[in-house]
Amino acid sequence: MAETTQTAGLSPRRTRIVILGGGFGGVYAARHLENLCRRRQDVEIVLVSRDNYLLMTPLLFEVCSGALDSFHCSVPIRAFLRATRFVEATVQSVDLERRVVQLAGHAESRELAYDQLVLALGAMTNRAMIPGSENALTFKTLGDALLLRTHIIERFERADIESDPERKRALLTLVIIGGGLVGVELFGELTAFVDGIAPYYKHVNRDDVRFVLLQGAERIMPEIDPHLADYGARVLERRTGAEIRTKTVVREIEPGKVQLSDGTIEAGTIILAAGIVPSSVVAALPVTKDIRGHIVVNATMQCQAHPEVWALGDCPQIMAPGGNPYPNLAQHALREAKTLAKNIFFALNGRAPEPFVYNTLGMMGSLGHGRAFGQLLGVRVRGVVAWFVRRTYYLMQMPGWGRRLRIMIDWAFALLSRPDLVKISVDSEAASLLRKAKLEGAFAKSQNEQTTQTDGGADRHEEVSRSGMRLGNAQRAGATQAGFHPGTGGES
C-alpha cells in the first residue's frame, strides 16, 4: 500500500481507487464500493467526471422532444455518492507505468495517482467515418439534446417566413444517419415532437416536413429481432410518412447537404447517430485492443498487462461464456459495476476475483408517443404495452422518489399538452465575456505563477503540480465551464 501526504483534502496512508467516468458504470461502481468498503478506513474512493451529474441516457430522447425536463433526468453525483470524493475535471491521459492520471479543469492542471484504476469513460461519436461529419449534430450528451431541440425549433421559425418553397422544404428536412437502435429511437421521438409543434406555424404545411433515416445495412436495427425491426419500420413509415433508406452509403456531409452514393439530400437538420468509438483517452492507452478500439480484458474485467486497471461499459470488450461479446447496454453497465466493485474489494483483501456473467434481460426501444417495442426474457412486446413497460423500467432505475415523481408529472403534462416552443439559447453575451475573462486571467496566472515544488519525501500520491496552466488548457476549461460540452459522448 502506497503512502500519501495530506494535500488538497486527501487523507494520508490510504489505498486510492480512482474511477474515471460519471456514467452508469462509473457511478454505480463507486456506489457499490462505498457499500463494500464502508468499514475500511484505509480505502479512499475518487470519481472523476467532466460533469457533476449522472445522466439517465435512456431518457435523453424525451428531453429532446420536450416530454421531460432536462434537470429531471440527471442526478447530482455528490448527492448520490456521499462517501466518494468527486473531482470535476477532464481526463487528459493516463500513465500506466507511473500510475497517475493527468487531469485538466477549472483553469489548472494536476496529476492524480491511484492504486486501483477503473476506466468507465464511455464512448464518443466516430466522426472520422464520414468526411464532413463536423457539419452534423450528434446525440450523446444533455447539451446535445437541448441543442438539437433548439435547432429544430429555429428551423421551423425560419421556414415560417421563407417564401421560396424549395428552400422551405429543405429547412424542414430532417436526416438521421444511422439506423441502429439509437437512431431509430431518436427518429421516433423527433417525429412526435415535430407533429406537436407544426400546428403552431401558420405558414408551414405538415406535408413540407420530410424525415429521412439512412442506414448502410440491409435493415434497420440489426442488433434486435428482425420481426421487431420490421414493426418499427412500419410504425415510422405509416405514422410519419418517413423515408427509411437501407443499403445507403453516405459519401460526405456538407453544410445543409448530405451527399449519398446515389444522390443528394438538402436538409436543415442533419444528425449523425452512426458509429461510436471508445474515448480518446482509451485510444491512447498502450494496452491490447480489439479491431474496434475496445480494451481487451479478461473475464474479471482486468487489463491483461495491468491487473490494477479495470474497465467496464463502452471501454472494454467483455466476452460472454459462449464466446460472443456482451452488448453495450445500460443494464450491462449496471451489472458490470456490481461485479467490478466486488472484484476490487476482493483484490484489496487478497482474494481471487470472479468472472462477470450476466443473462441479458432483453432490449427495448421507443418509437415516440405511445409506441415502443422490445424483447423481454425472450418474449416480444410492442405497442402501448411495450411503451408503458419501457417507461416504468427506466423510471424505477432513477435514484430517489423525488425525481421519479417529477418525471411522472412531466409525462402527465406531456400527454395532456403540446410540446413547449421555447427556444433555449446555449450561449449568451455574458457567458462569452465571462469565458474571455477567465482565459485572460488564466494566461496571466501562467505567466506569474512559479512551479510548485513538492517535498523530496512526498509520496507519489500527492496531487501535484499546480505548475501554471498553458493557454490551450485554459481554453478547453473555459469552454467547458461557460457552454455546453461538445457531443463527444465520453464521460470523462
Where are these regions (language model features)?
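Rossmann-like dinucleotide-binding core of oxidoreductases
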Residues: 168-224, 231, 242-245, 327-346, ...
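Short glycine-rich anion-binding loops that position phosphate/pyrophosphate groups of nucleotides
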Residues: 25, 122-125, 187, 276-278
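FAD-binding core/adjacent interface of flavoenzyme oxidoreductases
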Residues: 2-14, 85-175, 271, 491
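Beta1-alpha1 glycine-rich phosphate/pyrophosphate-binding loop at the start
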Residues: 2-93, 174-175, 181-224, 470, ...
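C-terminal, flexible cofactor-proximal segment of oxidoreductases
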Residues: 2-5, 12, 332, 341-492
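A Rossmann-like FAD-binding core segment of flavoenzymes
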Residues: 84-100, 112, 191-299, 303-305, ...
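FAD-site-proximal beta/loop scaffold in flavoenzymes
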Residues: 2-6, 134-164, 256-259, 264-335
